[in-house]
């Protein structure tokens, strides 16, 4: 059976959607952690962790919908994800967020390694995926540092 460009584009969008869903989960987890922190720590979490993940989430959605629009495929509205039980505590929510980021980055890395973005010939998509991964890249290290200094 021949692999068509349309099938390749749809598969690519499925992979990007999977990553977006994981980023949404990370955002929800960070939001829950934020709610449990004092004002100073919450502000730090917002600057160091939430903002880069939120930027990656927005960029990933724009990348998805722009690609879909250029190739006459349906766009998608992504909604918030549940974060988990509040009994996890701040560290638990941060661990969950980092896990979600790792899954999103893994999905995007696998997609990039597959050469599918090159095969469909879309430079804007490749640039968008690269930017999302770049935005997420430092977050796990910042989260570890945040946990180490929490309460000090």
Q: Which positions does each model-derived feature cover?
A:
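Short, solvent-exposed, charged loop/turn and helix-capping segments
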Residues: 66-91, 143-150
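Coiled-coil heptad-register positions
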Residues: 31-34, 38-41, 45, 75, ...
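Preference for long, well-ordered alpha-helical segments
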Residues: 100-103, 107-152
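Short, charge/polar-rich alpha-helical segments
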Residues: 90-98
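Short, charged/polar, low-complexity loop and linker segments
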Residues: 3-7, 76-89, 113-125
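Amphipathic, well-ordered alpha-helical segments in soluble domains
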Residues: 22, 26-29, 33, 63, ...
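Conserved alpha-helical segments that form or flank metal/cofactor-binding pockets of metalloenzymes
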Residues: 51-73
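Leu/Val/Ala/Ile-rich N-terminal alpha-helices, chiefly Sec-type signal peptides and the beginnings
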Residues: 1-57
């Amino acid at each position: 059976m021949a692999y068509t460009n349309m099938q390749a584009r749809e598969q690519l969008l499925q992979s990007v959607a999977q990553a977006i869903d994981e980023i949404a989960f990370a955002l929800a987890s960070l939001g829950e952690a934020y709610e449990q922190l004092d004002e100073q720590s919450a502000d730090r979490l917002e600057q160091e962790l939430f903002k880069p993940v939120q930027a990656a989430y927005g960029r990933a959605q724009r990348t998805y919908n722009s690609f879909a629009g250029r190739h006459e495929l349906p766009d998608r509205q992504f909604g918030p994800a549940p974060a988990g039980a509040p009994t996890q505590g701040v560290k638990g929510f941060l661990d969950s967020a980092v896990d979600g980021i790792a899954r999103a980055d893994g999905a995007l890395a696998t997609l990039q390694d597959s050469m599918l973005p090159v095969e469909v010939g879309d430079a804007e998509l490749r640039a968008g995926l690269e930017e999302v991964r770049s935005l997420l890249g430092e977050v796990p290290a910042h989260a570890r540092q945040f946990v180490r200094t929490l309460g000090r």
